Amino acid sequence: MFIVIEGIDGAGKSTQARLLAEWFKKKGYDVVLTKEPTDTAFGKLIRRLVLTGGKEGIIDGARISHEAEALLFAADRAEHVHKLIKPSLKTGKIVISDRYFYSSLAYQWARGLDLEWLIDLNRFAVRPDLVILLDLPVKESMKRINGRSIKTEFDKIAELQKKVRENYLKLAERFPEMRIVNALASVEDIHNDIVALVEHELLKR
């Protein structure tokens, strides 16, 4: 079973992915909790490149092309899929990922790239059984992001977040595996909503 948690910055993806993994573990499932960019050498390189103000920070929309950025993330994802996700699913594990190719579609589409090209670029990526989209108003997103000590360059502009949120909602209409959860609720309520979805959509099949 493969579940992905998506949403704009500040939506609480990492927290909810962790809570869901803990819920599955308590039920006796073997769980793999992962994220994108990954913790591989390639993923760490990308993560470092995305950090604002870093000496090696190149992804600012000026120093490399948006196409190159999309290809970098897709390359990390290819490693992720072939070395972790597919092998884990093959052995019957539950895989939960904090972000996946939907993030690339939402963000890079917001940067002006063609959606169909982005979908084709990520066609190798195995489709999840369920994608939880944590939907958060941009105003609340910016409030939460501003409280962080480290900001990625994706966090800089509210206008980008607005486009990304709109794109996520459009993607939810296109991809049948996506379900929307209100991320303005409390952490506990959001977790309960996700568990209810998992039980309804996956465990009772």
From Swiss-Prot:
InterPro entries: P-loop_NTPase, Thymidylate_kin-like_dom, Thymidylate_kin_CS, Thymidylate_kinase
Keywords: ATP-binding, Kinase, Nucleotide biosynthesis, Nucleotide-binding, Transferase
One Gene Ontology term of the molecular function aspect: ATP binding
A single cellular component GO annotation: cytoplasm
GO terms of biological process kind: dTDP biosynthetic process; dTTP biosynthetic process; dUDP biosynthetic process
Signal peptide start and end residues: none
Reactions catalysed, as given in the entry: dTMP + ATP = dTDP + ADP
Pfam families membership: Thymidylate_kin
Gene3D superfamilies: P-loop containing nucleotide triphosphate hydrolases (3.40.50.300)
Binding site for ATP: G7, I8, D9, G10, A11, G12, K13, S14
EC number: 2.7.4.9
Top-level class of the enzyme under EC nomenclature: transferase
Keyword Nucleotide-binding: yes
Cited HAMAP family: Thymidylate_kinase
PANTHER family in UniProt: THYMIDYLATE KINASE, UMP-CMP KINASE 2, MITOCHONDRIAL
Family per record: Belongs to the thymidylate kinase family.
Family annotation (NCBIfam families): DTMP_kinase (TIGR00041)
Name of this protein: Probable thymidylate kinase
